[in-house]
């Protein structure tokens, strides 16, 4: 992935014309965009929301109740992901597809994005940040077909979610590749950061749990307001907001009572 990023950068800067970045992958983009248009637009508009950092953290907030270090790894990775995304977008300033292609050539779902901040895809970066942070904590050394199936399934799901950015007409294919690569780095950094804190099993208790419940409740309220202000109210936003509200309530009342589970998921023992 890093080789692809380097090659694209050299090619574009060598020509001295930022529009060449889109020209290199115009046919790829149009082919994929048209192929994905066969699925209902509402599916893609909801799937693409899962690349929103607030939505992803809210939907996965139940991890706080059972595997808090995994959720903490995602939260810890967020600043790295944000910094990588903002820096790269400003540095490359690549035009989005709708900025250089004729409107009749592409299928756009939602608003047509025309800014010069296409590279990398922030959604792809967020998706892979979350996935890699989770896998690095829960399955740091996959063993056995079950665990490898989880890894493969996670990567497949992440790939589909990334493709939603092409489906809605927001990103070029290489935006997704670079975003995924940077997200991989951010996810590993978040997981490494989470390992430096030893108090995860008790993070739901006492003042820490109550403070965390306030944060999660605030996230829930923000998402529910956003859903109400976005007709017709994307189900992904409502689901994320309600999930976070339920987790905030659980934290407030101290449920579940038992301590959090160990972060690493072990392979079931084989019968002798």
Residue ranges and their predicted role:
Residues 34-45, 58, 62, 66-70, ...:
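Membrane-helix interfacial "entry" motifs
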Residues 3-4, 54, 74, 78-86, ...:
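Alpha-helical transmembrane spans of integral membrane proteins, capturing the lipid-embedded, hydrophobic core
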Residues 48-67, 123-138:
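Hydrophobic alpha-helical transmembrane segments
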Residues 1-8, 77-81, 155-156, 214-219:
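Alpha-helical transmembrane segments
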Residues 60-84, 150-151:
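Interfacial segments of alpha-helical transmembrane regions
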Residues 72-101, 161-169:
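Hydrophobic alpha-helical transmembrane segments of integral membrane proteins
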Residues 1-55, 87-114, 253-272:
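N-terminal transmembrane-helix/juxtamembrane module of multi-pass inner/ER membrane proteins
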Residues 107-257:
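Membrane-embedded catalytic cores of phosphoryl/pyrophosphoryl-handling enzymes
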């Amino acid at each position: 992935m890093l080789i692809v990023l380097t090659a694209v950068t050299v090619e574009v800067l060598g020509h001295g014309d930022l529009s060449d970045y889109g020209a290199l992958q115009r046919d790829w983009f149009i082919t994929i965009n048209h192929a994905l248009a066969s699925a209902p637009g509402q599916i893609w508009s909801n799937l693409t929301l899962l690349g929103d950092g607030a939505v992803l953290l809210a939907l996965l907030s139940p991890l706080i109740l059972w595997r808090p270090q995994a959720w903490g790894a995602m939260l810890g990775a967020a600043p790295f992901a944000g910094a990588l995304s903002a820096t790269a977008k400003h540095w490359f300033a690549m035009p989005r597809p709708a900025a250089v292609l004729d409107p009749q050539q592409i299928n756009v779902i939602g608003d047509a994005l025309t800014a010069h901040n296409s590279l990398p895809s922030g959604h792809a970066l967020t998706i892979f940040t979350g996935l890699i942070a989770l896998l690095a904590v829960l399955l740091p050394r996959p063993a056995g077909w079950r665990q490898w199936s989880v890894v493969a399934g996670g990567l497949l799901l992440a790939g589909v979610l990334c493709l939603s950015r092409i489906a809605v007409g927001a990103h070029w294919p290489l935006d997704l590749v670079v975003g995924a690569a940077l997200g991989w780095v951010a996810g590993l950094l978040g997981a490494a950061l989470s390992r430096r804190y030893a108090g995860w099993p008790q993070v739901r208790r006492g003042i820490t749990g109550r403070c965390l419940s306030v944060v999660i409740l605030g996230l829930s309220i923000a998402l529910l307001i956003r859903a109400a202000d976005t007709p017709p109210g994307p189900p992904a936003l409502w689901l994320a907001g309600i999930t976070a509200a339920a987790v905030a309530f659980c934290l407030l009342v101290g449920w579940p009572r038992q301590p959090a589970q160990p972060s690493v998921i072990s392979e079931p023992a084989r019968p002798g």
